[in-house]
């Protein structure tokens, strides 16, 4: 009789531990996952496409930029401004060098 009670008690304790023990481990894993969700990940923001692409001047934009910089383009140079600014990246100094070098002497 004592052996039967001992076996039942042992089985009950073992089964209870198995059920609740796995539940506690499972809850702990979820707590860790939830804490990871709360902690913000610090990373550098990804730049948008417009800021990654090199600024090139082609066509109408090139003409407007040239007119704003030099007025008329008086060139004696054999350099092609559209090749410099549309294929490569150019700046104000390139436009001054090709279109109006005499107007902006240093």
Swiss-Prot record:
SUPFAM superfamilies: Insulin-like (SSF56994)
Residues excised as propeptide: 16-56
GO biological processes: negative regulation of dauer entry
GO molecular function ontology, one term from the record: hormone activity
Signal peptide: 1-15
Compartments where found: Secreted
Coiled-coil region: none
Source organism superkingdom: Eukaryota
Annotated Gene Ontology cellular component terms: extracellular region
Disulfide bonds: 58-86, 70-99, 73-100, 85-90
PROSITE patterns hit by this protein: INSULIN
Keywords: Cleavage on pair of basic residues, Disulfide bond, Secreted, Signal
InterPro entries associated with the record: Insulin-like_regulatory (IPR052335), Insulin-like_sf (IPR036438), Insulin_CS (IPR022353), Nem_insulin-like_b-type (IPR003235)
Family indicated by similarity: Belongs to the insulin family.
Protein name: Probable insulin-like peptide beta-type 2
UniProt gene name: ins-2
């Amino acid at each position: 009789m004592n052996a039967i009670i001992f076996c039942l008690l042992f089985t009950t304790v073992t089964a209870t531990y198995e059920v609740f023990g796995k539940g506690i481990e499972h809850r702990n894993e979820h707590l860790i996952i939830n804490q990871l969700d709360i902690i913000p990940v610090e990373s550098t923001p990804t730049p948008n496409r417009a800021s990654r692409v090199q600024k090139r001047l082609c066509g109408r934009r090139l003409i407007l930029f040239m007119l704003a910089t030099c007025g008329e383009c008086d060139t004696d140079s054999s350099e092609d401004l559209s090749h410099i600014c549309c294929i490569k990246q150019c700046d104000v100094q390139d436009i001054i060098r090709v279109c109006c070098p005499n107007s902006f002497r240093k």
